[in-house]
Amino acid sequence: FYRNHKVTSIVEQRPVWSENPPEKEGRMYQVQADGEMFLAPIVINAAGVYADEIHNMICEEKIRIVPRRGEYRLMDKNCGDLVNSTIFQQPSKMGKGILVTPTVHGNLLVGPTAEDIPDKQDVDTTAEGLAKVLNLGSNSVDALDGRQTITSFAGLRAHLVHEAPAEKSDFLIEEAAGHPGFIDVAGIESPGLTSAPAIGEYVARIVENIYPAERKTDFIDSRKGIPSMALATEEEREALIRENPAFANVICRCELVTEGEILEAIHRPVGATTLDGVKRRTRAGMGRCQAGFCSPKTLEILARELQLDPAQITKEGIGSEILVGKNKETAPGEGGAWKKPQAPVGKEALHE
């Protein structure tokens, strides 16, 4: 797994025309990504809002994806029982509209908006968008209280745009014409999350038809979840602590997440390397205080276990570093050591 490697070019390497399948005729794709070069007979383009850029590197027939931003409010768990099922509104050409839904962990989720924007990295929330979420959500559940919002966020849906009305407008899942082994999984809008397992199986069948392979006899078809102290019985908690005392060290008080759970999240295959990675695997930081209490401890554990300087630990990848240095050391852009400001005296002290 090569994380944080931006693909900059894809070149198809193929010999003179042949009736043989790609793996026998030597057809390969050369993928350049942040100084690394990868060769593969099959490329699966599942790049979300960037899927058009990947597709257009190799295909003559171009596609265009417009990022469609959706803003959400996540409400406190004391609102989780306001509804017991998802409440939908009248759908429109932009989507299913503002919904109100209980989450599996007991919160209440309200949203999303739908707004086409030009920037594929713009996941900022807006005052107007969040007000719209609350106002329209209140049409379904009049007891919604904006003061119970514990966090808000925005995501981007990959809206596939075609000039010709007859062209497919979403769920482009197919082998690209004229480019065997290059598979698009693009324009996945609602219900993309629900469809994800079926999409995976469908793409696997496409791959099997292109590149026949034997099924593994020792394939592990299930994954043991990370133990949850919040959901465990008293007996299960005691057993976990006896096996590993780290399960007795509570890191996130809001969601009752322990050091033992965070260690499992870090050291599993394709383990967590960021604060958000830990959060998504364990819920550490997803509670009412939104990591105000646990983030320093989680950062410390990540740095220790990954053998990195704490300043290298990020929230969600490159560019989201949390620390800039240690107190009382040279500050960025300054020539001398940090000095404590002098306390004001005289009239200045009165104004303070």
Locations of the language-model features?
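Iron-sulfur (Fe-S) cluster-binding segments and ferredoxin-like electron-carrier domains
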Residues: 121, 258-269, 292-310
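Flavin-dependent oxidoreductases
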Residues: 10-15, 26-111, 115-126, 135, ...
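A conserved beta-strand/loop element that lines the FAD pocket in flavoprotein oxidoreductases
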Residues: 1-9
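Short Fe-S-cluster ligation motifs
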Residues: 279-295, 312-338
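Short flanking/linker segments adjacent to small metal-binding domains or redox-active Cys/His motifs
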Residues: 294-302, 330-352
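C-terminal catalytic lobe of FAD-dependent flavoproteins
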Residues: 91, 95-97, 104-105, 116-250, ...
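Hydrophobic/aromatic beta-strand patches that form the interior of the parallel beta-sheet core
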Residues: 2, 44, 183-185
